From Swiss-Prot:
Signal peptide: none annotated. It comes from the Bacteria. Belongs to the MoeA family. GO terms for cellular component: cytoplasm; cytosol. SMART domains: MoCF_biosynth. Pfam families: MoCF_biosynth, MoeA_C, MoeA_N. Gene3D superfamilies: MoaB/Mog-like domain, MoeA, C-terminal, domain IV, Molybdopterin biosynthesis moea protein, domain 2, Molybdopterin biosynthesis moea protein, domain 3. Homodimer. Interacts with MobA, MogA and MobB in vivo. This is Molybdopterin molybdenumtransferase. One of its GO terms (molecular function) is protein homodimerization activity. It comes from Escherichia coli (strain K12). Catalyzes the insertion of molybdate into adenylated molybdopterin with the concomitant release of AMP. Its cofactor is Mg(2+).
Length: 411
């Protein structure tokens, strides 16, 4: 793996990362209740038709068209309930009382909802036109036996798992979780809940990354804070590499910090690239250790979170076998705020996407965009993506926005 100098574009960096990794193949079979957020290892094929029988879409009356042609009231010959179908005789000139989900009796040509009927002394009168097949759910209408319901690579959520259960399937094979070893570096870091020493700050990056990893369904190996010592850092990399598919560090990759980090990484593996043409997030490193992939996040909180979101998230998705993109589609809107920008790097500013008084989408800035201001994520709901060569943006100009996904409480 050749080390690339200079500033690499985001697209080039992401393509470089994704081109090198291959999805995990190890799998395990789990009951559905344990499969939320997991990735299907093989297609789910339906063993049966859904629904498995013709049934009523409404509470009402099952009828034959010939019986209602005269317009006369029809006596009720029986009742059909969900789980208790009607099996008795169905004489000509009568109807069957039927409930939603109940099997329609043999010979039924339509179900008339009860709101379109009138109870008479001598039976039920139908007050609206009746069409053949109305309000009948046909067997296999939703899913037919033998159909691929969900392909391998699908991330399982509450949208998919109940469907699988409706097929009578109790467990499915899923790709094993991606194992990620995580640590922060720096003498200045302190654990939340502990008193701060002179010049110290609390370690927030590791918490943010840990939470995002759990949301993505990873198995997290949290190695804590590693002090600014080459021997300790080398030992941490060796331990992490022995346990994980991906090693993520926070801090230690900026200019002035990176000398011994780079030396250790080159000793233990290879570095693909070190610096990106994005803001925030310029000091991001990617490479390969003996057994795992390495992602070095910047120390500034916004920079660390942004590079994880834009680069590490897609990498983990590919490793896990997830075939869907985790990033919402970008869209063009007008800005209602003036945006400060210096040409030279792709800029991800935090913004608020909302509709104005005319019902049109527009975006406003969350305020100061410093790479240390993590509150911009809680205030915003999108990134304002400003092109590399673009300068300051005036009110009313068109910009590209990318709504936050579920990692930040978005889509």
């Amino acid at each position: 793996m050749e080390f690339t100098t200079g500033l690499m574009s985001l697209d080039t960096a992401l393509n470089e990362m994704l081109s090198r990794v291959t999805p995990l193949t190890a799998q395990e079979t789990l009951p559905l209740v344990q499969c939320f957020g997991r990735i299907l290892a093989s297609d789910v094929v339906s063993p049966l038709d859904v629904p498995g029988f013709d049934n009523s879409a409404m509470d009402g009356y099952a009828v034959r068209l010939a019986d209602i042609a005269s317009g006369q009231p029809l006596p009720v010959a029986g009742k059909s309930f969900a789980g208790q179908p009607y099996h008795g005789e169905w004489p000509a000139g009568t109807c069957i009382r039927i409930m939603t989900g109940a099997p329609v009796p043999e010979g039924c040509e339509a179900v008339v909802m009860q709101e379109q009927t009138e109870q008479m002394d001598n039976g039920v009168r139908f007050t609206a036109e009746v069409r053949s097949g109305q309000n009948i759910r046909r067997r296999g209408e939703d899913i037919s036996a033998g159909a691929v319901v969900f392909p391998a690579g699908t991330r399982l959520t509450t949208a998919e798992l109940p469907v699988i259960a409706s097929l009578g399937i109790a467990e499915v094979p899923v790709i094993r979780k991606v194992r990620v070893a995580l640590f922060s570096t720096g003498d200045e870091l302190q654990l939340p809940g502990q008193p701060l020493g002179d010049g110290q700050i609390y370690d927030t990056n590791r918490l943010a990354v840990h939470l995002m990893l759990e949301q993505l369904g990873c198995e997290v190996i949290n190695l804590g804070i590693i002090r600014d010592d080459p021997h300790a850092l080398r030992a941490a990399f060796i331990e992490a590499d022995s346990q994980a598919d991906v090693v993520i560090s926070s801090g230690g990759v900026s200019v002035g910090e990176a000398d011994y980090t780079k030396t250790i990484l080159e000793e233990l593996g290879e570095i693909a690239f070190w610096k990106l043409a994005i803001k925030p997030g310029k000091p991001f490193a990617f490479g390969k250790l003996s057994n795992s992939w390495f992602c070095g996040l910047p120390g500034n909180p916004v920079s660390a979170t942004l590079t994880f979101y834009q680069l590490v998230q897609p990498l983990l998705a590919k490793l896990s076998g997830n075939t869907a993109s985790g990033l919402p589609a970008r869209q063009r809107v007008r800005t209602a705020s003036r945006l400060k920008k210096t040409p030279g790097r792709l800029d991800f500013q935090r913004g608020v996407l909302q509709r104005n008084a005319d019902g049109e989408l527009e975006v406003t800035t969350t305020g100061h965009q410093g790479s240390h201001i993590f509150s911009s994520f809680s205030l915003g709901n999108c990134f304002i993506v400003l092109e590399r060569d673009r300068g300051n943006v005036e009110v009313g100009e068109w910009v590209e926005v990318e709504p936050f996904n579920a990692l930040f409480g978005g889509l």
